[in-house]
């Protein structure tokens, strides 16, 4: 949370200083618009845990499902136009995907012995999480020389989250004396839509140009965030954040 606040304050400061810096550089952005395509990584973490208690063989059993999703690869594309001087209006889309292994643990009562629960420990492999977002951005371009410029931007973000979640567990007895128990998880793809925000910066260096277009290479940083909930065991829901710190490189087209 502290890192998010610091990032937000830094970007806001850049926004405040950008017009003054552009004036100091003595340039108004001359291009009519841009198309950016990039690849990178989203750095973020979402740890989820759900605990349920249920009657089993006349006693109370406990099941715990946990999963932690971390950084994933990212694809990003954006387009925008100059609306006034160095002010731009644009829209961007990013897609990020990663997977993880979840864990199922618990204490399961015995059908034979009272107050002698069996310990359950099982791995749930290949839980997928896919994040998509559309960002509407207002930006300000700061030209630095003839070939290099930096654009700072921000605006609302509209996220779509598709995530695999363990929503139920079927238990099965093993062994002649019921000493062990196994679990077969029910995996459900949970889908959520949520609105958040984004702030960021994009740097471009032009490597080739003619009378119509300019081509370049660039890098970007974006911090995007929204919060929602996902269903886990039974009817329980757990909070999760989407977005995070995003970094990447790509190609730039100016027209």
Predicted regions and their residues:
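Transmembrane beta-barrel strands of outer-membrane/channel proteins
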Residues: 35-43, 91-95, 152-158, 203, ...
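Repeated loop/turn-to-beta-strand initiation elements of outer-membrane beta-barrel proteins
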Residues: 86-89, 148, 209-215
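Cleavable N-terminal export/targeting peptides
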Residues: 1-31
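Outer-membrane beta-barrel "beta-signal"
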Residues: 34-36, 242-255
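Residue-level signature of outer-membrane beta-barrel architecture
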Residues: 41, 81, 140-142, 203-207, ...
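Extracellular/periplasm-exposed beta-strand and loop segments of Gram-negative cell-envelope proteins
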Residues: 44-71, 94-133, 159-195, 226-246
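Membrane-embedded beta-strands of outer-membrane beta-barrel proteins
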Residues: 77, 136-138, 152, 199-203, ...
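Short glycine/proline- and aromatic-enriched beta-strand/turn motifs that initiate or cap beta-hairpins
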Residues: 20-84, 89, 254
């Amino acid at each position: 949370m502290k890192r998010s606040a610091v990032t937000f304050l830094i970007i806001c400061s850049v926004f405040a200083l950008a017009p003054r810096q552009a004036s100091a550089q003595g340039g108004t952005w001359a291009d009519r618009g841009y198309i950016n395509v990039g690849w990178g990584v989203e750095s973020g973490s979402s740890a989820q845990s759900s605990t349920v208690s249920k009657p089993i063989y006349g006693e109370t059993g406990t099941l715990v499902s946990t999963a932690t999703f971390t950084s994933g690869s990212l694809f990003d594309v954006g387009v925008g136009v100059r609306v006034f001087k160095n002010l731009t209006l644009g829209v961007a889309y990013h897609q990020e995907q990663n997977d993880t292994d979840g864990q199922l643990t618990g204490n399961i009562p015995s059908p034979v012995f009272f107050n002698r629960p069996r310990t359950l420990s099982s791995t749930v492999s290949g839980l997928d999480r896919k994040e998509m977002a559309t960002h509407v951005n207002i930006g300000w371009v700061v030209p630095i020389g003839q070939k290099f410029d930096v654009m700072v931007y921000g605006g609302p973000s509209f996220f779509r989250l598709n995530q695999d979640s363990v929503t139920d567990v079927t238990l099965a007895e093993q062994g002649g004396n019921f000493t062990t128990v196994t679990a077969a998880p029910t995996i459900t793809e949970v889908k959520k839509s949520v609105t958040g925000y984004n702030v960021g910066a994009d740097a471009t260096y032009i490597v080739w140009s003619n009378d119509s277009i300019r081509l370049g290479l660039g890098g970007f940083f974006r911090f995007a965030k929204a919060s929602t909930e996902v269903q886990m065991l039974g009817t329980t829901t757990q909070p999760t954040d989407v977005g995070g710190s995003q970094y990447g490189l790509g190609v730039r087209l100016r027209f």
